[in-house]
């Protein structure tokens, strides 16, 4: 969420009024087919991940009712491979029946093959002992992807806890992205109290968007405190969110012309049992992949606004890095 908190400038309102997401139209170029990359994994000895068949491929995303599917729309395509298995997939759908020239991307990730690390920003939430605000060291040489985290803490209605330090106190009931020392990630309503042993980070943002497979009743609320202040107080903007499926796989959605309701629908279509909204507005939302060696960054889609190299130097905002499991990143 942008740094103005509850104040949206007159210029932003005018800009949105002059250039809102267009209605109708078609997707320029259609659904892209990504070229999957092979992510580095240890080669010494058999791994549990390579020995098991892994989670089943998710069902295709549901195209909004009333739209004839585009070629490839909603179909999962391989994005990364590890140990001969698909480590990540991506699928795209149009957000609704009105904004038909836009696509929302959903990335599916297998935690048996990938691990997740939360990085604090220099300003959001501020410095955390033992944690870097950029990709560096060994992680930089193996990182496969990064994605944005949540709102500024003053707007998040929740807290930030990492490496034993409550930078901002955790709030019971808040939607929480919980990361463990083994690189696992879960999404839950915080039960209260201190994090359990093995938890290394908790990032909270608003209430749950999806709770036990049910979309929050307030997704159509016009109260900006519920789901965040958008540029020009607009409903249809760039949004992002994260969810975890019943099999433990992780899904991240990101795209333009999204309302809270259509973001929730995309995550639910991807099978999310629990999900939360992450940051919103075009300047803050992105999913970035990296080619190795060299951590060469690429935005997942060309319409993303933030620079692809935003996390290769100190970041003001916190973010999540994704690396191959077993690389020690």
Where are these regions (language model features)?
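Short, solvent-exposed loop/turn segments at the edges of secondary structure
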Residues: 102, 172, 237, 313-317
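Aspartyl protease catalytic domain
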Residues: 113, 118-269
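Short beta-strand scaffold segments in enzyme catalytic cores
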Residues: 105-108, 175-179, 240-244, 285-288, ...
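Zymogen propeptides
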Residues: 1-169
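Short, ordered beta-strand-loop transition motifs
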Residues: 95-101, 181, 246, 314
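C-terminal regions of proteins
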Residues: 284-329
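C-terminal soluble interaction/assembly domains
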Residues: 251-253, 260-292, 300-302
């Amino acid at each position: 969420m942008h740094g103005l908190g509850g104040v949206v400038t007159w210029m932003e309102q005018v800009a949105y009024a002059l250039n809102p997401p267009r209605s109708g139209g078609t997707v320029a170029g259609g659904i892209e087919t990504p070229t999957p990359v092979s992510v580095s994994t240890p080669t010494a000895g058999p791994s549990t991940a390579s020995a098991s068949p892994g989670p089943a491929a998710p069902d295709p995303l549901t195209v909004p009712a009333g739209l004839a599917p585009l070629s490839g729309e909603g179909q999962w395509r391989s994005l990364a491979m590890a140990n001969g298995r698909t480590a990540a997939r991506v699928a795209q759908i149009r957000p609704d029946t009105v904004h038909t020239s836009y696509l929302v991307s959903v990335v599916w990730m297998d935690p048996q093959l990938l691990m997740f690390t939360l990085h604090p920003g220099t300003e959001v939430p501020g410095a955390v002992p033992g944690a870097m605000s950029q990709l560096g060291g060994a992680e930089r040489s193996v990182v496969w992807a990064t994605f944005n985290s949540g709102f500024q803490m003053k707007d998040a209605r929740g807290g930030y806890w990492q490496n034993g330090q409550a930078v901002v106190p955790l709030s019971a009931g808040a939607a929480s992205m919980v990361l463990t020392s083994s690189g696992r990630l879960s999404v839950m309503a915080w039960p209260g109290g201190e994090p359990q042993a093995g938890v290394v980070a908790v990032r909270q943002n608003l209430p749950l968007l999806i709770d036990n497979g049910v979309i929050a009743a307030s997704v159509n609320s016009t109260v900006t405190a519920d789901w965040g202040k958008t540029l020009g107080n607009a409903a249809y903007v760039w949004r992002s969110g994260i969810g975890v499926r019943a099999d433990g796989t992780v899904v991240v959605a990101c795209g333009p012309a999204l309302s809270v309701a259509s973001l929730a629908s995309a995550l639910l279509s991807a099978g999310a049992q629990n999900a939360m909204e992450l940051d919103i507005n075009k300047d803050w939302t992105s999913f970035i992949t990296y080619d190795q060696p060299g951590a060469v960054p690429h935005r997942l889609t060309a319409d993303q606004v933030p620079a692809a190299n935003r996390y290769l130097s100190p970041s003001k905002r916190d973010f999540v890095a994704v690396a191959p499991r077993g690389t020690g990143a």
